[in-house]
Structures are given as structure tokens and as C-alpha cells.
């Protein structure tokens, strides 16, 4: 009888452990959201967003069941030019007054082997939602003595015009003043809760 009780207790402990969900919150001080877009066809402009939030919830050790949510305050855009930042906040681009948040909600986090993943989900900008995929590199975990941290780098490209951004004047030499493809890179350091 004692063996049965012990066996049941061990089984319960193991199944509880294996299905325990772990939540990770983004460490905003040690993370950033950057973007790059072509300008006048011949060069690129880089920028970032200063205000954002994100979380990851998973129960599997390989994170393959991870649910990821991310949001960006578009009014926090910074390209080191107040004039350009003001233009990006206008209706030509983000319309930050009417659509203050850009959001991402994951659909899948697929392991590709090693530390590589494909993160697919719904990205919403200007109230337009499209399914996008980011290439993710998982940096692993470390116990700092004050808690456990995990690191991720996500990279992907979106068509900004598909999200309702209107500014798209052509230049005489061909092409557009601002490219339609925007490369997004997120460096996320997450704190285990």
C-alpha cells in the first residue's frame, strides 16, 4: 500500500512538474526593438521604439508550446531626428494618436534545430492584422543569483504598405523615398517570474 501511495505521489509530482507553466516578462532595460528601412533607394535609416512590453508563457522545456505577446507604443519611435519622428507618428505612417499600439500575438513557436526557432503570429499595425514570421535565435538561460534570465533575438521583414502606411512617393531615378520593406530586430532579455 505504501508503495502504491508513493508511486501515485511520484507520478503526480512528475506530471505536475512537466505541465507547470512558466511565465517570462521582458526586461525593458536590457531589451530593444529596432527597425531598418531603405531611404532614397541608396541608403538606409535605422530607428527604434523606446516603450514596449512583452511576455512568454511555456510549459515545455524546449519552449515549443510558447505563447508570446508583445506590444509597442508607436509614439516612442526614435530615429535621432525630431522632424522625422514627428512624421512617423503622423497619418502618413503610424497615426500614433488614433492607433497608439503595435501588437504581436503568437500562433506558433516552432523549433528548427539547435537554438533556432520560427515564430509565427498576428502583427497588428494601424488596426490591420497580418500573419508574419520571425526568425528567432534562443540565447539560453542563466541564473544571475537574483533570478533566471533568458535571451532571444527575433528578426523579420514586413511590408509596411500592407499595414496601411500611406507615405510612398516615387523618386525620379526609380524606386521610392522610403522603402516598403522594413526589417525588424528585437533583442529580448526575459525574466522568469
Where do the model's predicted regions map?
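Low-complexity, acidic/polar, glycine-enriched regions of mature
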Residues: 20-193
